[in-house]
Amino acid sequence: QKKDKKD
């Protein structure tokens, strides 16, 4: 499971 972190 890959979580994309968007700032």
From Swiss-Prot:
Superkingdom of this protein's organism: Eukaryota
Entry annotated with the keyword Plastid: no
Modification sites for Pyrrolidone carboxylic acid: Q1
Assigned GO CC terms: extracellular region
Primary location group: secreted
Free-text tissue specificity from the UniProt record: Expressed by the venom gland.
Keywords per UniProt: Pyrrolidone carboxylic acid, Secreted
Location(s) in or outside the cell: Secreted
Keyword flag Transmembrane helix: no
Family the entry assigns: Belongs to the tachykinin family.
Protein name per its UniProtKB record: Tachykinin-like peptide-I
